[in-house]
Curated annotation (Swiss-Prot):
Coiled coil: none annotated. It comes from the Eukaryota. This is Thioredoxin M-type, chloroplastic. The lineage of its organism: Eukaryota, Viridiplantae, Streptophyta, Embryophyta, Tracheophyta. Forms a complex with heterodimeric ferredoxin-thioredoxin reductase (FTR) and ferredoxin. SUPFAM superfamilies: Thioredoxin-like (SSF52833). Disulfide bonds join C97-C100. PROSITE patterns: THIOREDOXIN_1, THIOREDOXIN_2.
């Protein structure tokens, strides 16, 4: 990862007497030795945000683009979708739905192609019925598009990738 390489480079150029702290997933980690960096990065394989402080000065605050579809549910909806500054695509699906399984690889491809430009989430309607009801989801798969916390568009059914790509391009 690019952030990991940058952090290792900074760590090797900084004296061990310096206070080096990185924060990920809301947890702070103080690096006090060269061996500690190896342990820390084993834990960082899936980090999406990093804040680096040296001697109490913020040196780096970076986010990596998430290039895979993440799960959203009733409890995380407001934070991940409504609170997002990046446009959002949400796939409403259920495990028993054949067309949902057909469209899933297309959503995965879009997440990779548009990493950093759009966030892609999937919401299991069986596990999160409140959000599905709130947005009037009556057929699945349904893909909703949000920008600045507002619902902008929807696509119902298993559609070709080109249809979804066109919608994504409209909102990025």
């Amino acid at each position: 990862m690019a952030l990991e390489s940058l952090f290792k480079s900074i760590h090797t150029k900084t004296s061990l007497s310096s206070s080096i702290v990185f924060i990920f997933k809301g947890k702070a980690c103080l690096l006090t030795s060269k061996s500690r960096i190896q342990e820390s990065f084993a834990e960082l394989n899936s980090f999406t945000s990093l804040v680096l402080l040296i001697e109490n000065h913020v040196l780096l605050h970076a986010r990596e683009a998430v290039n895979e579809v993440q799960v959203v549910n009733d409890s995380s909806w407001d934070e991940l979708v409504i609170g997002s500054e990046t446009p959002v695509l949400v796939d409403f699906w259920a495990p028993w739905c054949g067309p949902c399984r057909m469209i899933a690889p297309i959503i995965d491809e879009l997440a990779k192609e548009y990493a950093g430009k759009i966030k892609c989430y999937k919401l299991n309607t069986d596990e999160s019925p409140n959000t599905a009801t709130k947005y009037g989801i009556r057929s699945i798969p349904t893909v909703l598009f949000f920008k600045n916390g507002e619902r902008k568009d929807s696509v119902i059914g298993a559609v070709p990738k080109a249809t979804l790509s066109e919608k994504v391009e409209k909102y990025i």
